[in-house]
Amino acid sequence: RLRASKKLYQHMTLAVQQANRQFVTLTLREELLFGQNMTAEKRRKQEEALTFLGLKEKLEHSVFQLSEGQKKMVQLISLLSLDLDCLLLDEPFAGLDERACNYFVEWIKEKSAQQDFLIVMHRLEPLSGVSNYRIELLQQQLIIWQEGTTCK
């Protein structure tokens, strides 16, 4: 059973709410390269994200000196660059402004053809129209939504 779990975890990763707990290197550049098989396409996508989000000039800065929102952006850029079957995201947009949130929603949409996402959120509107299923806990009942239909 343990062997099956280890095998499963090789195909997925988790983004925790507190991005600080996930960083393993000092600089933003090192963090984005850590454990990655960097293709030209991944590098291009990371560069695009860094430029769009205003982080490109901070590549040599310590990730621990960034604001909480910037740390969350670095965490998402790093994890969305991975080629895994499944990403588990816990409050991925916490601390992000609307512009950054929309950027990552679009990136998730692009990647959803190749990857599965399990996303835990309190604010549902950013992912409206993105997910195939939505499970809500409402008044101690689970409500499952599937592409516009509801079943309890």
Positions of the model-derived regions?
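Conserved ABC ATPase "signature" region
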Residues: 41-58, 77-80
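H-loop (His-switch) and adjacent beta-strand-loop-beta switch element
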Residues: 130-148
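Conserved H-loop
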Residues: 114-121, 123-129
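Walker B catalytic motif
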Residues: 62, 91-92, 99
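A short, proline-enriched helix->beta-strand linker immediately N-terminal to the Walker B motif
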Residues: 81-85
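Conserved ABC ATPase signature
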Residues: 62-66, 70
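Q-loop/switch helix immediately C-terminal to the Walker
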Residues: 18, 24-40, 45
